[in-house]
């Protein structure tokens, strides 16, 4: 265990977190494509540490519904405030970008839009539909906000039939007031539960970040809660602080602990578990579709 000094969260990263940036012309080509189509990605907006690696392999996680979130989670680098109006042409442009990139597994996420009556569910559905038309053989994964628990909003997404529905619980319930003050742990579990009730053929997925003060026992309890609502896929990664104004890092979790979490997850019955320091919700997301769903 490597812990950060109390009150700083700035201890030097351990060796297992040192990462060499890839050298590839595809990084700039991917950035230009996204800029030309006026698209946001969570890779850029959330300052993801895997951005260079993903762009080098010509993949990206599209972020729809603007670049401004109505919530202010303490771990997240996405800007918060008053969001802009919905861009009705965005689904078409997302599909065009995915087609040009030649994606076989497309991941779409969004900011939280509590200002919209449906939370943006209709825009998710429109994006899924556009992707189906542009890339009939692609696997489509959506990572959504909680839509304030609205079953009608979730039903709109379910009717569009994504292959994977992802909603992250992010952390253990004890830490929600500090980490996700505007969210609710039980509501997030219920979102995953409702999606399975609406369409049992849609794979459900959730993710946790560790290193924010949780215990191993608390992580296992969350994993058990996720299995209780029939969650199929789990990701666990190290929280890395985007800036000094964000949530402090309490611990750098060693690789062997991630291996242990992955083994426990498989024992609990998850179809697929990705756990590691740099694992994020959509990092190497296509591995599930290849290994479990048979998409080549």
From Swiss-Prot:
SMART domains the UniProt entry points to: Elp3
Pathway: Protein modification; protein lipoylation via endogenous pathway; protein N(6)-(lipoyl)lysine from octanoyl-[acyl-carrier-protein]: step 2/2
InterPro entries: Aldolase_TIM, Elp3/MiaA/NifB-like_rSAM, Lipoyl_synth, rSAM
Keyword RNA-binding: no
Keywords: 4Fe-4S, Cytoplasm, Iron, Iron-sulfur, Metal-binding, S-adenosyl-L-methionine, Transferase
Co-factor: note: Binds 2 [4Fe-4S] clusters per subunit. One cluster is coordinated with 3 cysteines and an exchangeable S-adenosyl-L-methionine.
Cofactor entry: [4Fe-4S] cluster
Statement: the UniProt record of this protein carries the keyword Methyltransferase: no
Alphabetized PROSITE patterns for the sequence: RADICAL_SAM
Binding site for [4Fe-4S] cluster 2: 69, 73, 76
GO molecular-function terms, A-Z: 4 iron, 4 sulfur cluster binding; lipoate synthase activity; metal ion binding
SUPFAM superfamilies in the record: Radical SAM enzymes
Reactions performed catalytically: [[Fe-S] cluster scaffold protein carrying a second [4Fe-4S](2+) cluster] + N(6)-octanoyl-L-lysyl-[protein] + 2 oxidized [2Fe-2S]-[ferredoxin] + 2 S-adenosyl-L-methionine + 4 H(+) = [[Fe-S] cluster scaffold protein] + N(6)-[(R)-dihydrolipoyl]-L-lysyl-[protein] + 4 Fe(3+) + 2 hydrogen sulfide + 2 5'-deoxyadenosine + 2 L-methionine + 2 reduced [2Fe-2S]-[ferredoxin]
Binding positions for [4Fe-4S] cluster 1 per the UniProt entry: 43, 48, 54, 282
EC number: 2.8.1.8
Domain of life: Bacteria
Membership in a protein family: Belongs to the radical SAM superfamily. Lipoyl synthase family.
Entries under NCBIfam families matching the protein: lipA (TIGR00510), PRK05481.1 (NF004019), PRK12928.1 (NF009544)
Designated name of the protein: Lipoyl synthase
Organism annotation: Moorella thermoacetica (strain ATCC 39073 / JCM 9320)
Gene for this chain: lipA
């Amino acid at each position: 265990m490597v812990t950060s000094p109390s009150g700083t969260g700035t201890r030097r990263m351990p060796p297992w977190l040192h990462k060499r940036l890839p050298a590839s012309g595809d990084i700039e080509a991917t950035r230009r494509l996204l800029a030309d189509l006026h698209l946001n990605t969570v890779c850029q907006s959330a300052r993801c540490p895997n951005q260079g690696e993903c762009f080098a392999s010509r993949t990206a996680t599209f972020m729809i519904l603007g670049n401004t979130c109505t919530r202010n989670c303490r771990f997240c680098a996405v800007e918060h405030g008053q969001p802009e109006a919905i861009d009705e042409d965005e689904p078409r442009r997302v599909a065009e970008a995915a087609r040009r990139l030649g994606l076989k597994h497309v991941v779409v996420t969004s900011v939280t839009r509590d200002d919209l009556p449906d939370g943006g569910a209709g825009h998710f559905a429109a994006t899924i539909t556009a992707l189906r038309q542009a890339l009939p053989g692609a696997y489509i994964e959506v990572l959504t906000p909680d839509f304030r628990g609205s079953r009608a909003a979730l039903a709109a997404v379910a009717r569009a039939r994504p292959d994977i529905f992802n909603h992250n619980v992010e952390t253990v319930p004890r830490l929600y007031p500090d980490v996700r003050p505007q969210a609710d742990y039980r509501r997030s579990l219920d979102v995953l539960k409702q999606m399975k009730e609406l369409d049992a053929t849609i794979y459900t997925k959730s993710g946790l970040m560790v290193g924010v003060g949780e215990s191993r026992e608390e992580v296992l309890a969350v994993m058990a809660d996720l299995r209780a609502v029939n969650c199929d896929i789990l990701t666990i990664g190290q929280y890395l602080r985007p800036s000094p104004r964000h949530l402090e890092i309490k611990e750098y979790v060693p690789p062997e602990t991630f291996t242990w979490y992955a083994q426990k997850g498989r024992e609990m019955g998850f179809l697929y578990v990705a756990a590691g320091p740099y694992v994020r919700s959509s990092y190497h997301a296509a591995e599930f579709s290849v290994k479990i769903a048979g998409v080549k």
